[in-house]
Structures are given as structure tokens and as C-alpha cells.
Amino acid sequence: MSSSVVGASSNKKSGIRQSCEIIERERHSNDDTYSMTSTFFKLKENEIMSAQFDSLKYKILLISTAFVCGFGISLDYTLRSTYTGYATNSYSEHSLLSTVQVINAVVSVGSQVVYSRLSDHFGRLRLFLVATIFYIMGTIIQSQATRLTMYAAGSVFYNCGYVGTNLLLTLILSDFSSLKWRMFYQYASYWPYIIIPWISGNIITAANPQKNWSWNIAMWAFIYPLSALPIIFLILYMKYKSSKTAEWRSLKEQARKERTGGLFENLVFLFWKLDIVGILLITVSLGCILVPLTLANETSQKWHNSKIIATLVSGGCLFFIFLYWEAKFAKSPLLPFKLLSDRGIWAPLGVTFFNFFTFFISCDYLYPVLLVSMKESSTSAARIVNLPDFVAATASPFYSLLVAKTRKLKLSVIGGCAAWMVCMGLFYKYRGGSGSHEGVIAASVIMGLSGLLCSNSVIVILQAMTTHSRMAVITGIQYTFSKLGAAIGASVSGAIWTQTMPNQLYKNLGNDTLAEIAYASPYTFISDYPWGSPERDAVVESYRYVQRIIMTVGLACTVPFFAFTMFMRDPELIDKATHEEFTEDGLVVLPDEENIFSQIKALFRHNRSNKKLGC
């Protein structure tokens, strides 16, 4: 395999000049885009640095440092997802767990585009460092929060850092790999999940988050930066090596000669390039629409509150203003309509949206459901929640090698969607009670396989559909759609939970005070009422009822999910970083013969011809 990996990028040096010529043409055809920025030169820097990774030694170092960085990010995310539940429980506002998740996802929608576009302008490493600073700030604020509003504020900073580090790590690995091996490289930061599910439960049990959740979060303000240092130093070293080449010196000389515009001109350019107005409109709009859905519930009659109604109406109006702005005024729209008009782009984005929507609607409350209504211990519940990641991470090296052999991904995504349907059916059947343990484990395993076949495959398909100059932008849009799906999925599950759970608890428990405790602080409730007690049985029945509604919605959403997979294109994964030939406006032009419907028709024609020949 090692010789294949080296050979996968052996064409890079010879392809640098060709890639630079293509970018040069784009530069001169888009003078308004490049005249006052370093975007063109940063892309060429990436090309030169990429050639430095031809050695097997440096490829192993890149994958290893990505693994270490991914280990820090993934372990923190896994633990913090659980600690957030204990934090909201300590504020006696556990039902607002989805509110925090929605706030995280809404913030991510805007920040993804900013990171992707600025990384082309200032470089991947600088933005990675900025994201790390946000990560540390958010971690410190969350750990010291004494109320939900303060914790949510910390979540904004933390999530800006989290999505930034993930996106920039993906872009760094994409810059230095060919399409053929792109899946293998991108999964390197995901491999820690082979270990994490088996240690996270023990860590949570030993850390005792019921009492110590604050310190458990705070320690990651220095643990994660330490895990990121190896890849930071590696990139700095490769940049130093690149600076010794003649191409680099020539590039820097050209950059100095063509540097134009002062501070004000560059700020104005960035204002339009980042589409600041569009980012603010979509972020505020989604926040106004989605967050109230997780706050309003029948018990407090907040739906009759004028503030809730006004917020929802304002969000709807702002969304239409956003669409009008993007269509009429935005010089560099968040959603480039010309690019999105091709099914090779909009179909994978639709798959991304429903993939994350289905995941978050089914898993947002999975941990408390396991603890409260399935008699799982905290260790067992943590392992089950993380089991899909373990399955995907364990199978990813073998899947990546298969992809490198076949060089196609569309059928894998279709298979992943079919697996999602089976998974949601199992979650519907095994949604609570003592006999649900094996069924939930089976559903989690299938969920892991579906995630393996769908999530990163869609990213690689989109990157294969665009040129290098568009790769960061389209990857940022893909991440935006993933967070949009996550935000809406978490909002829908939160709305169902807050609208349905209180009444079910009041109905089954017959005690208003006890119902309020079970709703606001379920972890405290289960410590007082053991498994098999009448009160616990009543709560289990309530959880089963609510989970039935949530899983029904999730199962229904797999239908449009499947429809989008059928319309995707299936570009070949070549031995280059991107397709640079057969392109038009930064999009790879593919024939329509690879449409799945055309393939099915061709299959039937082949069968009929065989029958006529007597085969």
C-alpha cells in the first residue's frame, strides 16, 4: 500500500505548473476577485507545499499528526456532549439540552463559510490557529458557567473553534492528497474513534460529572492545544522546506510586485468576499426560527407569549430578506446559485442535509433515553452512544482502500442511505424497556456503517466536482449544510420533546411535583427511583411515547434522503488533487450517462439483448 500511496502523488510535481497555469487563467478572468487579496498566491503556496509531501516519511507524519489532533478533538467532543447534559441538569433545565445543541449548530452555519473563504485568503494554518483560540475561549467560559445563558454563550465560542478546527483539518488533508486517496487521508483524524468508545465510558464514570462537570470541561483548554501542536509544527516545517525552493522564492517576488490596495480597500473587499450581510441574516434568521421551537412548551403556555411569536415571525421575514439579498446584491453569495444549479452539487448537499438531520433527530436525546428508559449505566450508555463512531472508524481503512481501487462513490452513498432506513426502523422498535438493549446496539452498528458510507463520501464527491480554487468554498458549503441539518434536526427533536414529554409525565405519574423533577432533572430522578418502581415505570412509558414520535419523523425523512442520492453524479477519483480539465466556471463537466436511471435502463437493455442471443 505504501508504494501506492507514494505513487498517488508522484504526479504532483509535474502537475504544479499545469495547476498554476489554470489558477493563473482564473486569476486574470476574475481580476475583481484577486486584485486586492493573496488568494491566488495562497493556492499556489499550497501547490508547492503539496510537492514536499511526496516522501512516504512525510505522508506518515501527516497522517500521524492528524490522528493525534483528531484524538484530542474527538475525545473532547464525545465527553463534552455528555457533560453538557449534566451541566443543564445542574441548572434544573435538562429539557433545554436541545436548545444548546441548536445554538451550536446555528453558529456553525455562518462560521463554516467564513473559515473556508478566509483560509484561501490568509492560509489554512493561520485560520487553524484562530479556530484554536476560539476553542480555548469557549471551553473556559463553559467551564465557569453558573447558568444556562452563560453556558450557551461559551458554546458559541467553543463551537466556532470546534467547527473551524475540523474544517481546516479536512482542508489541510485535502490539499496534500489526491482524490484517489482523499478518503484515506480524511479518515485519519477519525481513527481515534476506534479507541474512544471504550475509554469514554470509563472516563465519564471516573470523572463523576454529576459533581465535577465544570473541571471536566476546563481541562480541555490545555489538553486540546497540546494535541494540535504536532500538526502545527509539521506544517511550519514543510513551509520552511518549501521556502527553500526556487518556485517559492519566485512566487513571493511576484506577490510583492502585485500587492495593491491599502487597509481600507482590503477590508471592503473582505466585506463583500465573505458576504458579511448574508452571514448575519442567515444566522439570525435560523436562530429566531429554531431556538424558540425548543423553548416553547405547553406547560408554560409560551406559545401564547408574544415574544415567542414575534421572534418566529422576525426569523421568517429575515430568511426571505436573506434570499433577496443573495439573489440581488451579494457579490460573492454564500450559496453561489450558478454552482448549485448542477445536480452534481445540489444532490450531494441534499444528501448531507438529510444525513445530519436524521442523525440529530434520532440521537439528540439518546443518552438520557438509555439511562432513564433502558436501565443502562453511564458507562454502557456512553459506549452505545459512541458505538456508531467506533464502527465507522474501524471499517474506514478497509473502505478507503476499496474506494482507491474502484474510484467511485455513488453506490456507496446509496447503500448508506438504505442502511439509515434499517437503523431508524430498529430505533423505532427498540425505544425503551428492559428488552431494548440488543436492538439499540444493532441499530447503533448499522448507523455507524451508514455514516461510513455517506458522510465523508459526499465531501470527496463534491471536491471531485470542483477545481482546487473552489475546493475550500464547496467544502465549507458542505459543512454548512451539515450544520444546517444538525440545527433543524436538533430543533425538531427538541420541539417534540418539550411539547410532548411534560404532558406525558403528568399523565402517567399523576403527581405534578414529581413530573416536574423527572422533566427538569432526569438524572437526579433515576437516582431516587430505581428500575422497577412504579414511578420509574411511568417515566419509561412516557419516554417510549415521545421516542415513537421522534423516530417516526426520522424514518419519514429517509425518503427524501434516498431521493437525493439517486440524482448525484459519480465523478472518477483520479491521481490528482482535483479535476482541472473539462471544467467550466470552476465545475467539472460530466456527461449525464452516469445518471443512475440511465444505468438502470442500460442494465435492462443488456439483459434483453442477452435473452435474444440465448445467453
UniProtKB/Swiss-Prot annotation:
Q: What is its main location?
A: membrane
Q: Which residues lie on this side of the membrane: Extracellular?
A: 80-120, 174-186, 238-275, 328-343, 405-407, 462-547
Task: Spell out the InterPro entries in the cross-references.
Answer: MFS (IPR011701), MFS_trans_sf (IPR036259)
Presence of keyword Ribonucleoprotein: no
What are the protein's GO molecular function terms?
Answer: antiporter activity; glutathione transmembrane transporter activity; siderophore-iron transmembrane transporter activity
Q: Name one Pfam family in it.
A: MFS_1
How is this protein annotated for GO cellular component? cell periphery; endosome; plasma membrane; vacuolar membrane
**Topological domain, Cytoplasmic: which ranges?**
1-58, 142-152, 208-216, 297-306, 365-383, 429-440, 569-615
Q: Which GO terms describe its biological process?
A: glutathione transmembrane transport; intracellular iron ion homeostasis; transmembrane transport
Give the UniProt subcellular location, in the record's own words. Cell membrane; Vacuole membrane
Tell me if Membrane is a UniProt keyword of this record.
yes
- Keyword field: Antiport, Cell membrane, Ion transport, Membrane, Transmembrane, Transmembrane helix, Transport, Vacuole
Q: Where are the transmembrane segments?
A: 59-79, 121-141, 153-173, 187-207, 217-237, 276-296, 307-327, 344-364, 384-404, 408-428, 441-461, 548-568
Q: Which domain of life is it from?
A: Eukaryota
- Topological category with respect to the lipid bilayer: Multi-pass membrane protein
State what induces this protein.
By iron depletion and by heat.
Job of this protein? Proton/glutathione antiporter that imports glutathione from the vacuole and exports it through the plasma membrane. Involved in resistance to oxidative stress and modulation of the PKA pathway.
- Give the family per the record: Belongs to the major facilitator superfamily.
Protein's name in the database: Glutathione exchanger 1
Q: Which organism is it from?
A: Saccharomyces cerevisiae (strain ATCC 204508 / S288c)
Q: Which gene encodes it?
A: GEX1
